[in-house]
Curated annotation (Swiss-Prot):
NCBIfam families: GSH_gloB. Binds 2 Zn(2+) ions per subunit. It is an enzyme of class 3 (hydrolase). It comes from Pseudomonas fluorescens (strain ATCC BAA-477 / NRRL B-23932 / Pf-5). Monomer. The keyword Secreted does not apply. Belongs to the metallo-beta-lactamase superfamily. Glyoxalase II family. Keywords: Hydrolase, Metal-binding, Zinc. Zn(2+) 1 binds at residues 56, 58, 112, 129. This is Hydroxyacylglutathione hydrolase. GO terms for molecular function: hydroxyacylglutathione hydrolase activity; metal ion binding.
Length: 255
């Protein structure tokens, strides 16, 4: 049985730690800082870091890779189409990779960055900065059309999929979601719950895909209420769901 834990980093990052208690081997996802991982390894003598999974090239996701590689000789997996430090295995869309005995499917999800990938294994999704709890990543390199397509691909996964994104942005994302859909009771309920969780210092991840479909405006571009608000914001009739997405993303960037 593999256990998944979060190692907080910086102000709002989570490094996901996968632990196989039988073999005492572990893997990490997007270690932007080596220190939390090294501290965990020091507190757990006998454990070996065998693998590092990277979703994209931004420093807050790869900053700790080289130091961890030097410390552990872990195998570094990352997107083939991006420059990833100390990468051993470059991954493309639809490839499969075995980590701690689990087989992960790789999805190309361009938008936040052009080479961004996500890792999926039977109800678990490690999606970096593509899909957030109640939100999505900014478009630093890709187009709105690319990001909308990437999110649609992730949204096609089973509803009970657990969403392991890498930032604690849920509260601010839900405030935006409520501005988009002020009459949505699911958003109001989730906002109240998340507000309480954050006041108690608790993390709000992982999310579930089912919950995202109810409360994440970027997965709800086909809803009439969302389209109407997007049309109202940019003063035009958005003819496609990707156009609705683009209007929402531009609004969120300034929210």
């Amino acid at each position: 049985m593999i256990q998944i834990s979060a190692l907080p980093a910086f102000t709002d990052n989570y490094i996901w730690l996968l632990q196989d208690h039988r073999s005492q081997r572990c893997a990490v996802v997007d270690p932007g800082d080596a220190a939390p991982v090294l501290a965990w390894l020091e507190q757990h003598p006998g454990w070996v870091l065998s693998d590092i999974l990277i979703t994209h090239h931004h420093h807050d996701h790869v900053g700790g890779v080289e130091r961890l590689k030097q410390h552990s000789a872990a195998t570094v997996h990352g997107p083939a189409r991006e420059k990833i430090p100390a990468r051993d295995i470059g991954l493309e869309d639809n490839q499969r990779v075995s980590i701690l005995g689990w087989e992960f499917e790789v999805f190309a999800v361009p938008g936040h960055t052009l080479g961004h990938i996500a890792y999926y294994h039977h109800g678990l999704l490690f999606c970096g900065d593509t899909l957030f709890a109640a939100g999505c990543g900014r478009l630093f390199e890709g187009t709105p059309e690319q990001m909308h397509h990437s999110l649609g691909r992730l949204a096609a996964l089973p509803d009970d999929t657990l969403i392991y994104c890498t930032h604690e942005y849920t509260l601010s994302n839900l405030r935006f979601a409520q501005a988009v859909e002020p009459a949505n009771p699911d958003i109001a309920e989730r906002l109240a719950k998340v507000t309480q969780m954050r006041e108690q210092g608790r993390m709000t991840l992982p999310s579930t895909l089912a919950l995202e479909k109810l409360t994440n405006p970027f997965l709800r571009t086909g809803e009439t209420s969302v389209k109407q608000k997007a049309d109202e914001r940019n003063g035009q009739d958005n003819q496609s769901q990707s156009a609705v997405f683009a209007a929402l993303r531009a609004w969120k960037d300034k929210f």
